[in-house]
């Protein structure tokens, strides 16, 4: 049995196959996911699981060197943005428009859909290296 806390086999599989600068996204329940991008749907009911619960779990498993966030997250959902900053520490933050973020999803290895109902609670995690 796994020793690390993350149990979701789909997320573990994607993260284990990621190389340097590969990307995975975590989104709220309304984020449109491109048909050709792997969807890991965790949404159970409204609000479950939350965006932050999911981000915390993925960060236990993945080395991240940069995150990509929409400008709108900071402007419309400042509490979510502050929580993200607390969780990622010194990781570089790149801001793009929400429309650009949606386009960037097609370059992600997977998009994790949560039950989150907060507007613009979306993030792209760019993989770092552990050495």
Curated annotation (Swiss-Prot):
- Tell me the keywords, alphabetical order: Carbohydrate metabolism, Cytoplasm, Isomerase
One Pfam family named in its UniProt record: RbsD_FucU
Signal peptide annotation? none
Report the InterPro entries cross-referenced here: D-ribose_pyranase, RbsD-like_sf, RbsD_FucU
Looking up SUPFAM superfamilies in the UniProt record yields: RbsD-like
Q: Using the UniProt record, name the top-level EC class of this enzyme in a single word.
A: isomerase
Q: What is this protein called?
A: D-ribose pyranase
Species source reads Clostridium novyi (strain NT)
Q: Which gene encodes it?
A: rbsD
